[in-house]
Curated annotation (Swiss-Prot):
Primary subcellular site in the record, as a coarse category: mitochondrion
Function: Accessory subunit of the mitochondrial membrane respiratory chain NADH dehydrogenase (Complex I), that is believed not to be involved in catalysis. Complex I functions in the transfer of electrons from NADH to the respiratory chain. The immediate electron acceptor for the enzyme is believed to be ubiquinone.
One GO CC term, this protein: mitochondrial inner membrane
Annotated protein name in UniProt: NADH dehydrogenase [ubiquinone] 1 alpha subcomplex subunit 12
Length: 145
């Protein structure tokens, strides 16, 4: 009986993603192919799912969009692609998704998503207010003879 339930759940995963091709596409992109109920979609196209049969911490997940702000994000997904209102629900800070109870507007929340620029030339580097302990040596300029 237990084997039948395991096979049934495996078949539900394959059919839940639109067949074998859709299952493999989701599996290779996210390294997991869960099936759950669609809770909502944000303004960027990310889809949020929930399955209460999974244990806590793995019962809510996101399937990222393939294009965001004109950038192809099929293989280049980033955790900062989740808006703040969905972050609350995704990390179980609140039980109500933003589709049923919208998050209050805050002035520090961006209206349009900005990608994480850590490790790129656009990253923020604060100005150093301390003096250098070691000064680099600059040789005196002498004309060539």
């Amino acid at each position: 009986m237990e084997l039948v339930q395991v096979l049934k759940r495996g078949l539900q995963r394959i059919t839940g993603h639109g067949g074998l091709r859709g299952y493999l596409r989701v599996f290779f992109r996210t390294n997991d192919a869960k099936v759950g109920t669609l809770v909502g979609e944000d303004k960027y196209g990310n889809k949020y799912y929930e399955d209460n049969k999974q244990f806590f911490g793995r019962h809510r997940w996101v399937v990222y969009t393939t294009e965001m702000n004109g950038k192809n994000t099929f293989w280049d997904v980033d955790g900062s692609m989740v808006p703040p209102e969905w972050h609350h629900w995704l990390h179980s800070i609140t039980d109500d998704p933003p589709t049923t109870k919208p998050l209050t507007a805050r002035k520090f929340i961006w209206t349009n998503h900005k990608f994480n620029v850590t490790g790129t030339p656009e990253q923020y580097v604060p100005y150093s207010t301390t003096r250098k302990k070691i000064q680099e040596w600059i040789p005196p300029s002498t004309p060539y003879k």
